[in-house]
Every structure is written in structure tokens, then in C-alpha cells.
């Protein structure tokens, strides 16, 4: 933890620098960042699981306590208004005593609706950052999530501090242990539900602590890109396993995918080819490279796989140009990663929020940035047998280029995705996922 504390000092200094710059530019007194409030289920007395505002948890790892506030201006010591009610029904969070607390002036809030007493006396020139705009209006904020401030913060959030990079390494390290446990469970005959339980046990995190709903897909379920059903019964025949699952560390996410074949066969060979292609794409990452160019290169590699494995005929570039590869690889190559799984800033050209749209032929690409040092991105090429997309090819002449017999052979396996989390450095790439032990 001392290593992390050392980096945290510089992290807070950088966040203060960013705030000082944007509030000066926008003639604001400062920012008031709301952790959020509980959301009550309809006609019930139970709340949905609480998720802290990512702008709040960028400053400190308070992840599960609603009704907290940060008051920052980039000059004075940041103030943390920490919610600690008198409550015999629920567990009350302890007053924080960690390495980061020395960087904050901490005030305790016992009643959520009394926060105005602890906020700056004249709030009119402070900007509110958070979800609950109705609360901000009642409190007197006239500036609520201003575009100029949000665009500035989102643009710079793509450049990670050393503290953030270390948190993400640890999130990867935790997730790798879960992936190894899940792989072992698959080969030992576990159901989707049982694999999920073994994953969560290995990472030591619950359903609401991991950064997103895990995808645990056996056989043809792997063709459903965001499959989260978790069947309790095993399939009649065990063919394949796709796992897309991450872990959290101090609010930062990992996002890792692997695909396995139960036996040595054509599908297993296709996984090997995809793994090789993915590593080649990662080798192409460097500062100055346009991420959309990497995505287009992925389509070229998918096209070659379609030819090599007799899924399609023709030439590779023609398969890309006709949109045939998009039927087999319909999603983007990856995205920014950080406080959020699909982290902000992936389309930002500059601090003003100038939008770089995805290519018209690839609307699901989640990042169009030019790569720069200290960015963290996922690299997740895939190839799937998705009938709804392949049926579109049957409607025109493109269907004549598809070897439907091979498609039928591979359909029960669902699909393949391989995803690593990569830090772009000035002179190298750091593949956290591989370097921390997941082949």
C-alpha cells in the first residue's frame, strides 16, 4: 500500500491542477462533486445497488457510500463531506482512515438533507457534477454538469496517472485469478451458474462489486455478445466456453475475455488463429496511431481467417469492403478503460469535446482517438456465428461467398472473443492481462 500511497500524492496533485485550470478558464469558484444517492425500487423499500459517480471516485476510493460530496477548487485542500448517519437498520460506513485521508479536510454529514450547512455559503458560482440535478437545483446550483467542464475532464481522464495505472494492474491481477478458476471449472464440467460462482469466489468480489455483469457463455450462447443469463443446467454436449469478466480495485476496472474449446478441433484452431491476430494487433499500438486504423486492420485479419478456415470465398479486402466481415465481427475492437468499463473520452478530439465520429461502416466502434502515452484500452477482436447477421448476407449476392456448411459446423460453438487490457507507453505497450499470468 505504501507504493500506492506514493503515487496517490502525485495523482491528487494532477487532479487539483486540472480543476484549477478549468475553473479559472470558466470563471467558476470550484466544483462540487456528488457521490450520488440511493435509488429505490418501484413500490418497494429496497434500493438498487449503489454505484458512485465516477467523477467522485476519481478522487478517492469511497465506492459504496451515497450522499457524500467533494468540494474542490484546485487551490485549497479538497473537502470531503462524508455521510455517516445515525442508523440502526443498516451498516454505517466507518470514518475513513486510509493513506488518502491526509489529502482531505473531512466533515461528517449525519442527515443527507442537511448538506447545505456544510457546502460553501454562496453556491451560485460553483458547478455541480453529478446525477441528481433536482437536488442540485434545490441547493441553488445554477451551473449543473456544464458541458465545458465535463468535456475537459473527460478528455483528460483518458490520460491515466501512475496511481491509476497501478490500480488497473491490480484489477487485472485479481481478474486473472478469476479467469484461471473459471477455466478450470469449465474443463471440470461446471454449469454457467457454477462457473460464475467459482469466478466470484476466486476474485473475492460479489455481483455488485465486479465492474460489469460477467458473461459466462457455454456453446452457442457465446454468439450473444452481452449474454448474462447464467444457465443452471449443463448443455447435453460441452463444446466451448466464452468468459468476459473483470474485477475492480479502488474503483478502477479490468475487462478481460477468453474463449476455450473443450476438445481439439477446427474451433480450437480458430481460437489459436484469433489469439495470434490479437497479439499482432497489440504490437501495432503506439503513440500517434489512430485507433480506427487498428479496428480496420482487425477486419483484414478476420477476413483472412474467414478464407483460411473456409468460411468464405473471395479476397480479403473484398470481404471487408462488402461488409461480410462485419457480419462475423460486428462490434468494435475495444474501448477506453478506467473508472468505467467503457470509459469516457473515447471520441474526444480535444478539451472542448469536439467529437470524432466512428466510421460510417463501423458504427459500434467505441474509440476514435489517436493513441497517446498512459492511455489504457481493451483489445478484443472476435468472430461469431450470429444467425440474425448472417441471414442478411443470404438476402443478396454476398451469401454466395459464404460456405454455409462450415457455418453450420461452427454454429454450436457460438463464437470467439479474446480481450486484453493494454497500457500505451511512449516506447512500448504493457499488456497487463498477459504479463500478470493469463495466457
From Swiss-Prot:
Q: Name one GO biological process term.
A: proteolysis
GO molecular function, one example? Answer: proline dipeptidase activity
Which cofactors does this protein require? Answer: Mn(2+)
What chemistry does it catalyse, as a reaction equation?
A: Xaa-L-Pro dipeptide + H2O = an L-alpha-amino acid + L-proline
* Co-factor note (free text): Binds 2 manganese ions per subunit.
- EC annotation from Swiss-Prot or TrEMBL: 3.4.13.9
Binding sites annotated in the UniProt record for Mn(2+) 2: 244, 255, 419
Q: Which of the seven top EC classes does this enzyme belong to? A: hydrolase
Q: Where does Mn(2+) 1 bind?
A: 255, 335, 380, 419
Q: Which Pfam families has this protein been placed in?
A: PepQ_N, Peptidase_M24
UniProt keyword annotation of Thylakoid present? no
Which PANTHER family does its entry note? XAA-PRO AMINOPEPTIDASE 3, XAA-PRO DIPEPTIDASE
State the family it belongs to.
Answer: Belongs to the peptidase M24B family. Bacterial-type prolidase subfamily.
Q: Which HAMAP family match?
A: X_Pro_dipeptid
Q: What is this protein called?
A: Xaa-Pro dipeptidase
The gene name reads: pepQ
